[in-house]
Amino acid sequence: MRILQRALTFEDVLMVPRKSSVLPKDVSLKSRLTKNIGLNIPFISAAMDTVTEHKTAIAMARLGGIGIVHKNMDIQTQVKEITKVKKSESGVINDPIFIHAHRTLADAKVITDNYKISGVPVVDDKGLLIGILTNRDVRFETDLSKKVGDVMTKMPLVTAHVGISLDEASDLMHKHKIEKLPIVDKDNVLKGLITIKDIQKRIEYPEANKDDFGRLRVGAAIGVGQLDRAEMLVKAGVDALVLDSAHGHSANILHTLEEIKKSLVVDVIVGNVVTKEATSDLISAGADAVKVGIGPGSICTTRIVAGVGMPQVSAIDNCVEVASKFDIPVIADGGIRYSGDVAKALALGASSVMIGSLLAGTEESPGDFMIYQGRQYKSYRGMGSIGAMTKGSSDRYFQEGVASEKLVPEGIEGRVPYRGKVSDMIFQLVGGVRSSMGYQGAKNILELYQNAEFVEITSAGLKESHVHGVDITKEAPNYYG
């Protein structure tokens, strides 16, 4: 029998406190998603069909993290999800949605409803700005067959030229009491749009994770051989692709990674793996970040069904040992129950954590609401569950094309307590990590990694760590028993 190592998970270890002059409120949580993309908080929402679509992704990016839109949908639908995130706000919208004057108000309503916007510039066939259609123009219109050109606010409009700063734009909009400022070139061709909503959001969400154009960052999951999907997502403006598999150390994954890096300019996160060798091979093939975790998720049964995996603390430690030599970030995916688990993962050298169950219960997640015994819940399922596999994730478990009755699941379907908004959950997780860094005397995540020392604890130590000898009469927002 070949026993390679003693393997530990989050509940097996604790960090030892250190002398500290660092206050939790003063620490920096800035980190990296990939070698080229930063994060303002080290949190990623999982690419699961009950966790991340555009609403979760928008919420995560506004808070400084990022969401990974799942792939259990056709290419066009996934592209639309990415577009909704990229269009949700922007410093300057460089490719604004527009409409032609001969279109109907019904057409305009489809556009505004689909992209959740309150108005749209109107252009002619040459792209020249000729008006703008806003809520004010259509508020009392009941005949949706009317032409946009008959209802819109016509030129002259208050406009600005390419290169205007957001501060200058804000002053101009305030002066003229307008909510939308079209950006035009010297020939009056529409080149961009600035909205007062985006300026307000910049103030409301100062830590938002944005790209070079002021748009929220977002990632998307793809499967083996899905180069067409990857290309369409990159065209839509996705910031990073997640090449997602239950077994990231496979020939097909390595081949797909090499093909993507050869043909597209985009950062690729690859996983899932748990060994040094796998990490080395993925980095050699071009991975911009490595995702770690086989079987730690609450809804994953891989370790039981297949007898394969590794406890998450040891898995992170293995992969970080190799990835750190190449300055490649490691993402700890799965097994996070408490904010203390996040702190442990970061102290082990992970650059960020990917979260599923804790976000599945939020308002923004795509799971279904349900009431059970008088309490609110939301549905949550593993991507290896029968339901998820029949919707498109079977390739993640190397069962693509298998009839539904022949699938061998590696996950279950269940429910999790409703936990309010994404911002409420992230607030508690961030607060816990800040507290941990204060105990460790770490001003930033790098110092946490450099400073942290661990002790292995017994089952009695774990029991002592949890609430004991008392009945909880009022639940805490960050402790689930």
Curated annotation (Swiss-Prot):
State the source organism's domain of life: Bacteria
Q: In which pathway does it act?
A: Purine metabolism; XMP biosynthesis via de novo pathway; XMP from IMP: step 1/1
* Cofactor(s) in the UniProt record: K(+)
For the ligand (IMP), the binding residues are: S298, D333, G334, G335, G356, S357, Y380, R381, G382, M383, G384, E410
Residue numbers annotated as active site: C300 (thioimidate intermediate), R396 (proton acceptor)
Q: Which GO terms describe its biological process?
A: GMP biosynthetic process; GTP biosynthetic process
Residue numbers binding K(+): G295, G297, C300, E464, S465, H466
Ranges where the CBS domain occurs: 92-148, 152-209
Keywords annotated in UniProt: CBS domain, GMP biosynthesis, Metal-binding, NAD, Oxidoreductase, Potassium, Purine biosynthesis, Repeat
One Pfam family of this chain: CBS
| Reactions accelerated catalytically | IMP + NAD(+) + H2O = XMP + NADH + H(+)
Positions binding NAD(+) in this chain are D244, G293, I294, G295
| Record-linked Gene3D superfamilies | Aldolase class I
- For this protein, what is any one GO molecular function term? nucleotide binding
Its activity is regulated as follows:
Mycophenolic acid (MPA) is a non-competitive inhibitor that prevents formation of the closed enzyme conformation by binding to the same site as the amobile flap. In contrast, mizoribine monophosphate (MZP) is a competitive inhibitor that induces the closed conformation. MPA is a potent inhibitor of mammalian IMPDHs but a poor inhibitor of the bacterial enzymes. MZP is a more potent inhibitor of bacterial IMPDH.
Q: What class of enzyme is it?
A: oxidoreductase
Could you say which EC number(s) this protein's record lists?
1.1.1.205
What protein family does this chain belong to? Belongs to the IMPDH/GMPR family.
User: Assembly and partners?
Assistant: Homotetramer.
Name of the protein in its database record: Inosine-5'-monophosphate dehydrogenase
Gene name tied to this protein: guaB
